[in-house]
Each structure stands twice: as structure tokens, then as C-alpha cells.
């Protein structure tokens, strides 16, 4: 394997930007900083007037393989990922069939080994009747990024709504539990009310149906369970101002037992955008009123929110163009997340160092990933 020497670049790492060289041997960073001289005749890369970032780690993607490959594959989406600077991903279990057994989990790893262009890990899926299979994942702490629980329904019908089972999983899981938190009873009630009063639902109704209260109540429930059992809990795609009161920033990330993720679309869009984009920005949890977006930004900058991710969820254009109730939920974002955050760096909303912290360092720390997320 070739050796590379990146010369005179701006290295963005651990809260600082420093100028220097970086030596890479056999795919591994060997030396960082200063002027590096080597006798191995490496391939030199001129890094002057450029910034060198760690590869982005996205802890929430849906790459659709197996079973939904008319939408995407591990190969196609990992290709999009690396094109956008995402060099590691963690993929969700709502494929077809869902990743409910160890055999199906291993199948994903086998596919990725052959086709992925990026580093990878996969979440084990939970349902209402696969507890024994889920617990077998405890033996794979160094391979599997975590256990995913849909505490609210979304693409794939993986809803876990048995309170006794939820308590049991939180009590006995030795891996990180990642949750999709939207209270199903509130969603159903809101939908029924709207159907009773409106002839045709539209995209903007999504934020009313999957409202702030649905998110808060379910996140609160997950945190109660985590406190009860001292579970390592990671709540995905926080989308509301109200949920932020559930999270703290007193202790460093590495000491937190409960962490929170925010997604780029909740930092970028608001409910006002439904008027133009319609179902194209339909996603779960919903994009909501603008004050939520501003609160999310504040919480990201003050470290109540720990990680920036995408929840990358591709569909065909036909699947997105249906009526509101038929249109699929999800946005394709993995190729665009870094570029979007760099846009906000240019706007002065966030520093480049903070982007690297939230998209690289913190993800590696949250999931205890070695040799990734830092330079």
C-alpha cells in the first residue's frame, strides 16, 4: 500500500486548527504536525490553503439492503457517503426483512464486507417478539454499534410498544440502546382528529400529527427507563425545544450515560418549508416550527446535544410524490451533511472546530470507536 505525505495543511483536530504535515502509512496515520521528513518516498499531497478534517462518522443511516434495493444499496449509499466526506456509518435495522436475528445481522456485515466503500457497523433491531435474539447481541460489543428500538412507528413497522418488554430490554442490554422516540398513542390521536376535520391532509400536517408532545413524552419515557436500569441510552434525532430540558451538559461526553443526537435537516428546515417542498421533507420525527430549530442550534453549541447525524433515508421520487398519507418519510442526506454544516460555518453559525467535534470526535467517543474520528 502506498504511503502519503500531506504537506503544509491546516489540521482541524481536538478544538484547534494547526498547520503542519500528516504522514499516512499503509492506510494508517503515523505522524501529525510540524514538518515531517521521511526516507520512504511517499506520495506527496499539497495541502496548502486547505483544511484537513477527520472522516465524518454518521451514526444513523438507512441504506435499504437487503430487500429494499430499488431505493438504494450498501454500495450506492456508501459511495454517496464517501463523496460527502462520511467515511464511517452505522446502519439501521428497518430493512426487509428487519434485522431481527443474528443471522440477518451477520448477512448485513457480509454484504458490507464485499461492497461498502466506507467503514461500517450495524444496529440490531428489536421487535415485540425477538428478545432472545436481541440479547445475543451482548456477546458482540466490539462489533455491533448498538441495539435500535423504535419506540414510535416509522418506516418498516418495527414499533416496540410492550412496556414489560421495553423494561426488560433496558434492564439487560449491555450495549448502547439507540431509540426513535415518538409516542404512538399521541400520533394516532392527532391523526384521527385531523382526518375528522380535514378532507385532504397535506405535508404541513405532519408537524401537527407528529407534534412536540409526542416526541417529549416518548423521550421522557426512554430516559426514565435508562435511569431505572443505568442503561447506556442514545436518543436519536431530537427535534423539539421541549425535549432539550431532558438533557444535560454538566459532565463531559465520555462520562454521560444518556446522549442525544440532532440531524442536519432539523437544523436546516422549518415547518415553513412544507409550503414549497411538501412531502420531499416529510420525515420522522417531523420538521417543526422555527423556534424548535433555533433551540436545537443553541443546544448543539452548548453541548446538550452531542452528535450531528443525517438519518439518511432514500426513497424513489415516486414514493415521495404521493399524497401525504402515502408519501414515504425520509430524506437522502449522507452526501450533503458536511457541505451543509460547512455552509453554516461560512455563515458564522458554528465554527469548523465545533463541526468536527460533533460529526467526528463526539461520535467516536459516544460509541467508543477506536482509531476513527480524530487525526
What is the meaning of each model-derived region?
Residues 1-39, 50:
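N-terminal metal-binding scaffold of metallo-dependent hydrolase/deaminase domains
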Residues 9, 22, 27, 49, ...:
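Divalent metal-coordination and catalytic microenvironments
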Residues 50-115:
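Metal-associated gating/positioning segment near the N- to mid-region
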Residues 86-88, 118, 145, 306:
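Short acidic/polar active-site loop segments enriched in Thr and Asp
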Residues 90-91, 121-124, 232-237:
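Short catalytic-loop micro-motif centered on adjacent basic/acidic residues
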Residues 110-126:
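A glycine-rich helix N-cap at a beta->alpha junction
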Residues 132-308:
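Histidine/acidic residue-rich metal-binding segments in metalloenzymes
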Residues 203-221, 225-230, 301-308, 313-375:
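His/Asp/Glu-enriched, well-ordered alpha-helical/loop segment
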Amino acid at each position: 500500500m502506498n504511503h502519503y505525505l500531506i504537506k503544509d495543511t491546516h489540521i482541524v483536530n481536538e478544538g484547534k486548527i494547526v498547520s503542519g504535515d500528516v504522514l499516512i502509512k499503509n492506510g494508517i496515520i503515523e505522524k501529525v504536525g510540524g514538518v515531517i521528513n521521511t526516507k520512504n518516498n511517499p506520495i506527496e499531497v499539497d495541502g496548502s490553503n486547505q483544511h484537513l478534517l477527520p472522516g465524518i462518522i454518521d451514526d444513523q443511516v438507512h441504506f435499504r439492503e437487503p430487500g429494499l434495493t430499488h431505493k438504494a444499496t450498501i454500495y450506492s449509499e456508501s459511495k454517496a457517503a464517501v463523496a460527502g466526506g462520511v467515511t464511517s456509518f452505522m446502519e439501521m435495522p428497518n430493512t426487509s426483512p428487519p434485522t431481527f436475528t443474528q443471522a440477518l445481522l451477520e448477512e448485513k456485515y457480509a454484504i458490507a464486507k464485499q461492497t461498502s466503500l466506507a467503514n461500517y457497523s450495524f444496529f440490531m433491531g428489536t421487535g415485540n417478539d425477538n428478545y432472545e435474539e436481541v440479547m445475543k447481541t451482548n456477546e458482540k460489543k466490539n462489533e455491533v454499534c448498538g441495539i435500535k428500538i423504535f419506540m414510535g412507528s416509522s418506516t418498516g413497522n418495527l414499533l416496540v410498544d410492550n412496556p414489560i418488554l421495553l423494561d426488560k430490554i433496558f434492564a439487560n442490554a449491555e450495549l448502547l440502546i439507540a431509540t426513535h422516540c415518538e409516542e404512538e398513542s399521541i400520533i394516532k390521536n392527532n391523526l384521527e382528529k385531523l382526518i375528522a376535520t380535514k378532507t385532504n391532509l397535506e405535508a404541513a400536517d405532519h408537524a401537527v400529527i407528529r407534534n412536540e408532545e409526542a416526541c417529549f413524552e416518548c423521550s421522557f419515557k426512554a430516559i426514565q427507563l435508562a435511569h431505572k436500569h443505568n442503561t447506556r441510552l442514545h436518543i436519536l434525532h431530537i427535534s423539539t425545544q421541549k425535549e432539550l430540558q431532558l438533557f444535560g451538559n454538566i459532565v463531559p461526553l465520555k462520562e454521560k450515560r444518556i446522549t442525544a443526537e440532532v440531524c442536519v435537516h432539523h437544523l436546516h428546515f422549518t415547518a415553513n418549508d412544507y409550503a414549497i417542498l411538501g412531502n420531499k421533507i416529510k420525515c420522522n420525527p417531523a420538521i417543526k416550527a422555527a423556534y424548535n430549530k433555533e433551540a436545537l442550534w443553541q443546544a448543539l453549541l452548548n453541548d446538550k446535544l452531542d452528535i450531528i447525524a443525517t438519518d439518511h433515508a432514500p426513497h424513489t421520487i415516486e414514493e415521495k410524490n404521493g399524497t401525504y398519507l402515502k408519501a414515504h418519510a425520509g430524506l437522502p442526506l449522507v452526501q450533503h451533511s458536511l457541505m451543509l454544516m460547512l455552509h453554516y460555518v461560512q455563515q458564522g453559525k458554528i465554527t469548523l472546530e465545533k463541526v468536527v467535534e460533533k460529526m467526528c470526535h463526539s461520535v467516536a467517543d459516544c460509541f467508543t470507536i477506536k482509531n476513527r474520528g480524530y487525526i
